[in-house]
Curated annotation (Swiss-Prot):
Basic residues: compositionally biased ranges: 321-331
The protein's name in its UniProt record: Protein PHTF2
Biased composition (Polar residues): 182-192
The keyword Membrane is assigned to this record: yes
Major localization listed first in the record, in broad terms: membrane
Glycan attachment sites: N291, N659, N718
Subcellular location: Membrane
Cellular component aspect of the GO annotation: endoplasmic reticulum; membrane
Residue span(s) of domain PHTF: 6-153
Bilayer topology term: Multi-pass membrane protein
Bias (Basic and acidic residues): 172-181, 353-362
Region feature Disordered, mapped onto this chain: 170-192, 268-365
Ranges annotated as biased composition (Low complexity): 340-352
Length: 747
């Protein structure tokens, strides 16, 4: 229904726009429709020695983003928590078997507590909030987790969407053959398709004929497919695909690239995996793919989790890469293609497979750097070898350029400028010896990351979270004791009497069971929530360490103390790599997932503060006579401490990265160098001008740190500020006896 309304809007927009057109506008539209189809084209390359503003801003290093809006994710999270057992397959995919079992036990205990509360005899001292409170926390945790894992939501492999994308990919691969010789025929396509099937592949005759028919169909309609692909070559962040293939969005970068490959592996396509070094039985692959969760709502499709992706993605990726060299070898055999290109293609493919086969499930930083540098050098060697033989034919370069994940994720700094070859002279210390070495940006960042990973974090906030979990679990018992007797009379009661008062009953088994179950569920859920906050706190701390070590690079004393390389911004190339390293380190580590956790804590704190202020303004004399108010006060204090920690770390990190005193110091060093070496004054003046421009650019792009959530929208931020601070002002004015304003609207 929504698509029909959208089509109607587009149609009517064009209809009324036709009445406003003049002759000149119609002729211009006809020229625009032709576009670049009839224009002569030749091979071009992006200039690797230039930088984009996206590189300085950091958006070039894009992170994965969810396809669905936050409202849809919130709704799905609530549904998946309420009907937890029915979504067991999804929870198993996005968590682990142990965690799922733990959550299932908590879910069943919570259901049992509700049943016991409704079935227990009415005269008991157990408040409703003691049983209902864990439910709200469970819904919050489920929503947060659903938003965190929302970036890994591939569509079903056997669905219509997957078939449509598979058709587009096959059409795009056929266009590659057409570009190679200009006249690829159906026979060549069919022959290549037959050759791609291995002798030992468990393929049925019907599957072979189906693929042959698909190849012939897409070859006949290749012009139509090419037109549809050409219209969609521009991506969301302004990059244009050079090979005519629709690239993935920058907001989904590498994760979406693997998802597309996972979608192309159906039950019948699983035979490709048997030809790779990381081979798995076709039946196992088929079983794993067909067992994808089918209980998710229809608009999102089943969400394949980490275990499936970690097993199938590498298999499908290796299978697809093994299949493509057969196409190229067959295609270029009749044209006397240089042997160097073919050998280079197989070498690139085999080297990538070797690196993937030895890669563990959780990739370490060292393997990432090694693979990244290796891919860059492999690409450069492929290009140089094939260009020498025949510059018109370069199958290796084209295939690798199309399949390169760094190209797919819009990282021109990583794949175009060859970071493995672009180095700067840096000083390193080995004990008391000072030595000079040529280092790339990846090597410098790798040393910084190793230093951060070796840092031993404190456990203060972990202990604080554990203490708050225990305190919130014991709050109902303390509340009943305080309501029953005064503090002076506690010593007069025996232990058995205190036990009866704390648990609300002595003989009723249902009440005792309900209290114990609520205690276990409450402590467990609160501990999970503060565990997430501790993860966010550790991430913010690592970001601060990244910023600190980055600031130590241009200081000889601090670099030696921190055991990181040291270099000066005395060349334009050094400034470029310094800016690249700065943006790269800012984007390292968890970003959106941690922001989701912090945003949830921020919104929860706002809600708790507002409820507390409303309760204090309503009846502040009997504020502590309600059990939920006790819990709200504890939540408010604990969450405020964590938020203050987040704000402190985030502001300090932004301050470290926005420290223009480094650039000013380097400008002073350049003037000192001009005085000592007048013959290099022109070169040093050029570097000084670039430093001034870099200083202005950083001031232009940098913004102060803000917690995510309502603060992203200025209107909502001002409304929230007015509501919350007005309530706090009213409480303080009521308690102190004079008017006090704590807020001021800012435009």
């Amino acid at each position: 229904m929504a698509s029909r309304v959208t089509d109607a809007i587009v149609w009517y927009q064009k209809k009324i726009g036709a009445y406003d057109q003049q002759i000149w506008e119609k002729s211009v539209e006809q020229r625009e429709i032709k576009g670049l189809r009839n224009k002569p084209k030749k091979t071009a390359h992006v200039k690797p020695d230039l930088i984009d503003v996206d590189l300085v801003r950091g958006s070039a290093f894009a992170k994965a983003k969810p396809e669905s809006p936050w409202t849809s994710l919130t709704r799905k999270g609530i549904v998946r928590v309420v009907f937890f057992p029915f979504f067991s397959r999804w929870w198993l995919q996005v968590t682990s078997r142990v965690i799922f079992s733990w959550l299932l036990v908590l879910y069943l205990l919570q259901v049992a507590a509700i049943v016991l509360f409704c079935s227990a005899p009415s005269p008991h001292s157990i408040p409703l909030t003691e049983v209902i409170g864990p439910i709200w926390l469970m819904l919050l945790l489920g929503t947060v987790h659903c938003q965190i894992v929302s970036t890994r939501t591939p569509k079903p492999p056997l669905g219509t969407g997957g078939k449509r994308r598979r058709k587009l990919r096959k059409a795009a691969h056929l266009e590659v053959h057409r570009e190679g010789d200009g006249s690829s025929t159906t026979d060549n396509t069919q022959e290549g398709a037959v050759q791609s099937y291995g002798a030992g592949a468990p393929y049925s005759v019907g599957t072979v004929f189906r693929d042959l028919w698909l190849a012939a169909f897409f070859l006949s309609g290749s012009k139509k497919a090419k037109n549809s692909i050409d219209k969609s070559t521009e991506t969301d962040n302004g990059y244009v695909s050079l090979d005519g293939k629709r690239t993935v969005k920058s907001s989904e970068d590498g994760a979406q690239y693997h998802e597309l490959q996972c979608e192309t592996v159906g039950p019948e396509d699983a035979a490709w995996a048997t030809r790779t070094p990381r081979s798995v039985p076709a039946k196992d692959t088929q079983r794993k793919i067909t067992n994808v969760s089918d209980e998710v709502s229809s608009e999102e499709g089943p969400e394949t989790g980490y275990p499936l992706r970690g097993h199938v993605d590498r298999t499908s990726e290796s299978g697809l890469r093994n299949r493509k060299p057969h196409h190229y070898k067959k295609h270029y055999a009749n044209e006397d293609a240089p042997k160097s290109g073919t050998s280079c293609s197989s070498r690139c493919s085999s080297s990538r497979q070797d690196s993937e086969s030895t890669r563990p499930e959780s990739e370490t930083e060292g393997v990432l750097w090694e693979d990244l540098l290796h891919c860059a050098e492999c690409r450069s060697s492929c290009t140089s070898e094939t260009d020498v033989g025949n510059p018109q034919i370069n199958p290796c370069g084209k295939k690798e350029y199309r399949d390169d994940p760094f190209h797919q994720s819009h990282l021109p700094w990583l794949h175009s400028s060859h970071p493995g070859l672009e180095k700067i002279s840096a000083i390193v210390w080995e004990g008391n010896d000072c030595k000079k070495a040529d280092m790339s940006v990846l090597e410098i960042s790798g040393m910084i990351m190793n230093r951060v990973n070796n840092h031993v974090p404190g456990i203060g906030y972990q202990v604080f979270g554990n203490a708050i979990s225990l305190i919130l679990g014991l709050t109902p018992f303390v509340f009943r004791l305080s309501q029953a007797t005064d503090l002076e009379q506690l010593t007069a009661h025996s232990a058995s009497e205190l036990y009866v008062i704390a648990f609300g009953s002595n003989e009723d088994v249902m009440v005792l069971s309900m209290v114990l179950i609520s205690f276990v569920v409450r402590v467990s859920l609160v501990w999970i929530f503060f565990f997430l906050l501790c993860v966010a706190e550790r991430t913010y701390k690592q970001r601060l360490l990244f910023a600190k070590l980055f600031g130590h690079l241009t200081s000889a004393r601090r670099a030696r103390k921190s055991e990181v390389p040291h270099f000066r911004l005395k060349k334009v190339q050094n400034i470029k790599m310094w800016l690249s390293l700065r943006s790269y380190l800012k984007r390292r580590g968890p970003q959106r997932s941690v922001d989701v956790i912090v945003s949830s804590a921020f919104l929860l704190t706002i809600s708790v503060v507002f409820i507390c202020c409303a309760q204090l303004l309503h009846v502040h004399e009997i504020f502590l006579d309600c059990h939920c108010n006790w819990e709200l006060v504890i939540w408010c204090i604990s969450l405020t401490l964590f938020l203050l920690r987040f704000v402190t770390l985030g502001s300090e990190t932004s301050k470290k990265y926005s420290n223009t005193s480094i650039l000013l110091t380097e400008q002073i060093n350049l003037y000192l160098k001009m005085e000592k070496k007048p013959n290099k004054k022109e070169e040093l003046t050029l570097v000084n001008n670039v430093l001034k421009l870099a200083t202005k650019l950083l001031k232009e792009l940098d913004s102060p740190f803000r917690l995510y959530g309502l603060t992203m929208n200025p209107l909502l931020y001002n409304i929230t500020q007015v509501v919350i601070l007005s309530a706090v002002s009213g409480v303080i004015s009521d308690l102190l006896g004079f008017n006090l304003k704590l807020w001021k609207i800012k435009s």
